[in-house]
Swiss-Prot record:
It is a peripheral membrane protein. Keywords: ATP synthesis, ATP-binding, Cell inner membrane, Cell membrane, CF(1), Hydrogen ion transport, Ion transport, Membrane, Nucleotide-binding, Translocase, Transport. Belongs to the ATPase alpha/beta chains family. GO terms for molecular function: ATP binding; ATP hydrolysis activity; proton-transporting ATP synthase activity, rotational mechanism. This is ATP synthase subunit beta. PANTHER family: ATP SYNTHASE (PTHR15184), ATP SYNTHASE SUBUNIT BETA, MITOCHONDRIAL (PTHR15184:SF71). The keyword Oxidoreductase does not apply. It comes from Klebsiella pneumoniae subsp. pneumoniae (strain ATCC 700721 / MGH 78578).
């Protein structure tokens, strides 16, 4: 085990000099005793002359030149397997929930090759989420990748919590949650929400919050992914939740300049597409088991053309776009049914009835969107009878796309609803065909199935 010395510290980037014949390889872990703490560094570049440039996985405060650094001769390794379920860990796989050791039987390196082309498998099977707007407009595939796009405060984390709760209770699968650069409060809420829903023993939690150094946030997604890969390789169908993939990119941007790389567009790292690819190519399903991933993607300044969300788009099967405009109408989940897409929305996959219903809903909402300008200038009375009917149905559809969530019961005061796909299709088909034209539009707001809307109308 070779020993080196620190020669330079710039923020999160630390240069270490080793003997010429024992230079650590790229991505190997190094350890340095910093006061009472043991700090782990990860090698990023070999600069020549025995010097390696590393990223610190913790705070580099208190480091100084001349400190001894040990080469561990392997990449960062984290616990995997069933022992991680119900536990909160950090980027190094150390427990942070004060419940003692993980007691794992196996540790895996966080840097691994993606499965080969022969091992991959694709599935056409749908994953029912119980959320109407998602199941109808942008259905998820088992073993697929989903992105939740949205600006600040439109409900990405709440949507993700609801998905975990529904899938854990209705499908009883294992989940891994990687919290990348998000608020500590959200991590805390999340843990308590999972405990209250009695699904904590099916979820492994890996956190690297906003206050952590960039090296930590850059690697915590890989830690979570490694745990998910282990479950997949045991032949299970596992869910991987990443909140938030943008912070992973941002952490790369923060260290990129310190590593001496030229910035590219908007100041992002020049290796943006490659870094995203390395992570995304590993999130995949093999012939042994599947990883279905749901990734929250923060959209800076609500601009979907920003390089970070734009790079993420390319890797996804389904995109759920959350809109501030819909949130401002009080319709939650604030999913934009015209912007959200899914590769699965194909009559050969979902069936003709589902496909026709989804496209019908989109065309009615699109027509309403076009008529809004006329209504704003001339008022409703100037519309033809046909258009008035379209507007009335569109407004009902818009309200019916809202739904009370289990994880948001404290905010909404109404009990959560899980809606089966067949009920969702039946409801929207009925509204489109005019079966519910006689009901007031308030009846459709914040209900589960269409039968509840009919009941609610009787009380209005």
């Amino acid at each position: 085990m070779a020993t080196g010395k620190i020669v330079q510290v710039i923020g999160a980037v630390v240069d270490v000099e080793f003997p010429q014949d024992a230079v650590p390889r790229v991505y190997e872990a190094l350890e340095v005793q910093n006061g009472n703490e043991v700090l782990v560094l990860e090698v990023q570049q070999q600069l020549g002359g025995g010097i390696v440039r590393t990223i610190a996985m913790g705070s580099s405060d208190g480091l100084r030149r001349g400190l001894d650094v040990k080469d561990l001769e392997h990449p960062i390794e984290v616990p995997v397997g069933k022992a991680t379920l119900g536990r909160i860990m950090n980027v190094l796989g150390q427990p942070v929930d004060m419940k003692g050791d993980i007691g794992e039987e196996e540790r895996w390196a966080i840097h691994r090759a993606a499965p080969s082309y022969e091992e991959l498998s694709s599935s056409q099977e749908l994953l029912e989420t119980g959320i109407k707007v998602i199941d109808l407009m942008c259905p998820f595939a088992k073993g697929g990748k989903v992105g939740l796009f949205g600006g600040a405060g439109v409900g990405k984390t709440v949507n993700m919590m609801e998905l975990i709760r529904n899938i854990a209770i209705e499908h009883s699968g294992y989940s891994v949650f990687a919290g990348v650069g998000e608020r500590t409060r959200e991590g805390n809420d999340f843990y308590h929400e999972m405990t209250d829903s009695n699904v904590i023993d099916k979820v492994s939690l890996v956190y690297g919050q906003m206050n952590e150094p960039p090296g930590n946030r850059l690697r915590v997604a890989l830690t979570g992914l490694t745990m998910a890969e282990k479950f997949r390789d045991e032949g299970r169908d596992v869910l991987l939740f990443v909140d938030n993939i943008y912070r992973y990119t941002l952490a790369g941007t923060e260290v990129s300049a310190l590593l001496g790389r030229m910035p590219s567009a908007v100041g992002y790292q020049p290796t943006l597409a490659e870094e995203m690819g390395v992570l995304q190519e590993r999130i995949t399903s093999t012939k042994t088991g599947s990883i279905t991933s749901v990734q929250a993607v923060y959209v800076p300044a609500d601009d979907l053309t920003d390089p970070s969300p734009a790079t993420t788009f390319a890797h996804l099967d389904a995109t759920v776009v959350l809109s501030r405009q819909i949130a401002s109408l009080g319709i939650y989940p604030a999913v934009d049914p015209l912007d959200s897409t899914s590769r699965q929305l194909d009559p050969l996959v979902v069936g003709q009835e589902h496909y026709d219903t989804a496209r019908g809903v989109q065309s009615i909402l699109q027509r309403y969107q076009e008529l809004k300008d006329i209504i704003a200038i001339l008022g409703m009375d100037e519309l033809s009878e046909e258009d008035k009917l379209v507007v009335a149905r569109a407004r009902k559809i818009q309200r019916f796309l809202s739904q009370p969530f289990f994880v948001a019961e404290v905010f909404t005061g109404s009990p959560g609803k899980y809606v089966a796909l067949k009920d969702t299709i039946r409801g929207f088909k009925g509204i489109m065909e005019g079966e519910y034209d006689h009901l007031p539009e308030q009846a459709f707001y914040m209900v589960g199935s269409i039968d509840e809307a009919v009941e609610k109308a009787k009380k209005l």
